[in-house]
Amino acid sequence: MSWIAKCGALLLIFCMITSCESVNDERIPPVAVYIDFSNQAIWDTYGVHGYGQYRQFIKQDRIPANFPYSALTYTGFGGVLLISGRAGDDYNSPLAYDLACPVEAKNNIRLSIDPQTFEAYCPKCHSRFDVCENNGAPISGEALSRNYGLQRYKVNPAQMGGYIITR
C-alpha cells in the first residue's frame, strides 16, 4: 500500500472516530444574545441563586413581564434559559442556553425544565438535556441519537456585580 493510501485511510478512520463523539450544539440559527444583569440589584431580582433554580427570558413575549428589557436586549432564537448549575467545582454557577429545541429548530418550540431532575426537555420530540452539569448535552430521545446538544451562551461576571449573558 502506498504512503498516500495509508495516510488517506488513517485520515478516514480518524474522521469516523471523532465525528461519532462530538455533539452538535450549533443547530440553532445565530441570533444576537445580550441580557444585562450588570448591577447587583437586577441580578438579585432576576438572577438564579441555587442549584437547579432557573428563569426564562423571552423578549418578544415579555417574559418575565416586569424585566427591564431595553432596545439593546436580545434573547436569542427561542429565548434564553438561565439556570444555576455546576461549572468545574462550583455547584452554584449561572449557565445559559437557547430555549429552542435543537431537534425541532423552531423558535416557538421551547424547552421546559423537569423540577424533579432539573433536566430540560422538549414537549414535542421528548428529547432530554443535562443543563445543570453537562453543558446541555443530550441524554435521551432523538437529540441523543443525533448528537444534538443545546446552544450555550456565555455568562460573564460584570464589574458592578451580577452578570452579562452574550452569544
Would you name each region that the model predicts?
Residues 14, 95, 116-119:
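Processing junctions and N-termini across compartments
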Residues 128-141, 155:
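Short metal-binding segments enriched for Cys and/or His
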Residues 23-114, 130, 151-167:
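N-terminal pre-ligand scaffold of iron-sulfur
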Residues 15-19:
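C-terminal motif of bacterial Sec signal peptides marking the signal peptidase cleavage site
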Residues 98-100, 124-126, 135:
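A mature extracytoplasmic/lumenal domain signature
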Residues 64-69, 135-139, 143-144:
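Surface-exposed intrinsically disordered loops and tails
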Residues 117-127:
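Cysteine-rich micro-motifs
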Residues 1-8:
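Bacterial N-terminal signal peptides that target proteins for export
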